[in-house]
């Protein structure tokens, strides 16, 4: 019975992975269709506008409010205040 249960869990994991990938792919913007070389000027203008929008979506930076990581790094590593490390051999009552 055990090997059959392991196979079922494996198949369920594969199906779940495929479903997750499909959901992720739906959220990705689609590339605009090329109207062709003989298209009117208005359609080419719409295509280039849609292509510019698509490229801006794909290549935008996703850093949030602060895009400069140099400012953020020291605060994360050291904090704003200097931390005094206390040895466990230092007795606060004796000093």
Curated annotation (Swiss-Prot):
UniProt similarity note: Belongs to the NPY family.
Annotated PROSITE patterns: PANCREATIC_HORMONE_1 (PS00265), PANCREATIC_HORMONE_2 (PS50276)
One GO term of the biological process aspect: feeding behavior
Family matches, as PANTHER family: NEUROPEPTIDE Y/PANCREATIC HORMONE/PEPTIDE YY, PRO-NEUROPEPTIDE Y
Keyword ATP-binding: no
Protein name per the record: Pro-neuropeptide Y
InterPro entries assigned to the protein according to its UniProt record, in alphabetical order: Pancreatic_hormone-like, Pancreatic_hormone-like_CS
Signal peptide: 1-27
Function: NPY is implicated in the control of feeding and in secretion of gonadotrophin-release hormone.
SMART domains: PAH (SM00309)
Modified residues (Tyrosine amide): 63
One of the record's GO molecular function terms: neuropeptide Y receptor binding
Pfam families with a match to the protein in the record: Hormone_3
Subcellular location, principal: secreted
Keywords: Amidation, Cleavage on pair of basic residues, Neuropeptide, Secreted, Signal
GO CC list: extracellular space
Localization of this protein: Secreted
């Amino acid at each position: 019975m055990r090997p059959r249960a392991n196979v079922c869990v494996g198949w369920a994991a594969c199906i779940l992975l495929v479903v997750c990938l499909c959901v992720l792919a739906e959220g990705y913007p689609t590339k605009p269709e090329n109207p062709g070389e003989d298209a009117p000027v208005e359609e080419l203008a719409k295509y280039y506008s849609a292509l510019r929008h698509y490229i801006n979506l794909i290549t935008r930076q996703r850093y949030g409010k602060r895009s400069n990581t140099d400012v953020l790094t020291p605060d994360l590593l050291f904090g704003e205040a200097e931390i005094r490390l206390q040895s466990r051999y230092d007795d606060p009552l004796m000093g």
